[in-house]
Amino acid sequence: MEEPAAPSEAHEAAGAQAGAEAAREGVSGPDLPVCEPSGESAAPDSALPHAARGWAPFPVAPVPAHLRRGGLRPAPASGGGAWPSPLPSRSSGIWTKQIICRYYIHGQCKEGENCRYSHDLSGRKMATEGGVSPPGASAGGGPSTAAHIEPPTQEVAEAPPAASSLSLPVIGSAAERGFFEAERDNADRGAAGGAGVESWADAIEFVPGQPYRGRWVASAPEAPLQSSETERKQMAVGSGLRFCYYASRGVCFRGESCMYLHGDICDMCGLQTLHPMDAAQREEHMRACIEAHEKDMELSFAVQRGMDKVCGICMEVVYEKANPNDRRFGILSNCNHSFCIRCIRRWRSARQFENRIVKSCPQCRVTSELVIPSEFWVEEEEEKQKLIQQYKEAMSNKACRYFAEGRGNCPFGDTCFYKHEYPEGWGDEPPGPGGGSFSAYWHQLVEPVRMGEGNMLYKSIKKELVVLRLASLLFKRFLSLRDELPFSEDQWDLLHYELEEYFNLIL
């Protein structure tokens, strides 16, 4: 089905003749074509071109002059019984001039004078002021004068340009005066400024985190220019502006155009973290900076004390060892000689000497019960006692490897620094040495341990199972002779050490 063609010249001539007759008789029609109930005056003239083409004649209503130029075809009468009139052609674009451009109303039409839609806001203004009649229609049914009224020259001259009206929106203006009043004011400014190209080109830049600003502008007198520093201080004090994250940690790439506060530079940390007007914040920040500076100085002094310390066994500078794990000191509890942690532990684990010799200092032979690993060299007695206490507290939070696997007994007893507790699911605490004979207790110690839900030995590898069984038989034989053979203190210490090495291997 083909699209209906544009109105013919004969039809336009008929419409023009009918409009001329209506104008001579003093009859005025509305802006838009409206169907008349009867077409007596226009029927004879309008039927001629249709009769020539074989169409049925139908009445035609008078058409205004500005619509006749656009080529709009009037609608047929409802009671004529003829074919419906073809749709108007949109190729010419004249019909769009009857519709006000929605972008021009908001001051954002980028077409300017080349826009297909109307930029005449006089009819819209009168309709808004009247509040009852739409643009182009009058209350008495007569001709509408809104479409022919032009804004006064004085208002056009005094209206500000559209670009300046949208430079910095304010939220509260539309809420106080009403939305329609703000819309009318901005429509007047847009009409006075002509095309709204400048308004959308000079719009403010969107910044993440910036509060929402309304679309309309409140007419307010321009404030006198102030310096950027004074204005920023007033904003910071009045609105509680937050510090800029980037400026407080280095450099802000936005510079002076940043919407957040750039504080003063602190002499201690060198960052822009001091509030320009808040004295309490400045004092608190300075106190925190001084405390951090004191801690850094103490750390620097501690590192400086151990820079030239040489291990008394390997004769190497502790901080210059190849392995980073060996760059620690082994602090003896009763001696001030310096050793690296690796060398002093190897010395104290030697078995070819007596226990009192092993636990003594390699240089001064003073016995020390503890060896505390430390990254810094500690020499004063007060600092050493503090270090020992911190070491014991740290060890008390770790589970003892011998207590759980020994089913409630540790070879070191009360002198052990580690935590003695049973894992979850082990049930009640097993009986100690006082519950039976000493040989029976050690026999129970080397038996397989119930762990979790099933029975398993320390490891499930066949070789380790054989070693464990042989060790169990050896301990049973050795403990059976315990009451017959006298044991010295050093021999019992050696036994404890062998037990420790044994469990280290098996676990």
Curated annotation (Swiss-Prot):
One of its GO terms (molecular function) is RNA binding. Residues 1-21 have a biased composition (Low complexity). It catalyses: S-ubiquitinyl-[E2 ubiquitin-conjugating enzyme]-L-cysteine + [acceptor protein]-L-lysine = [E2 ubiquitin-conjugating enzyme]-L-cysteine + N(6)-ubiquitinyl-[acceptor protein]-L-lysine. One of its GO terms (cellular component) is nucleus. Pathway: Protein modification; protein ubiquitination. It is found in: Nucleus. A zinc finger (C3H1-type) spans 95-122, 238-265, 394-423. Keywords: Disease variant, Metal-binding, Nucleus, Repeat, Transferase, Ubl conjugation pathway, Zinc, Zinc-finger. GO terms for biological process: protein polyubiquitination; protein ubiquitination. This is E3 ubiquitin-protein ligase makorin-3. It comes from Homo sapiens.
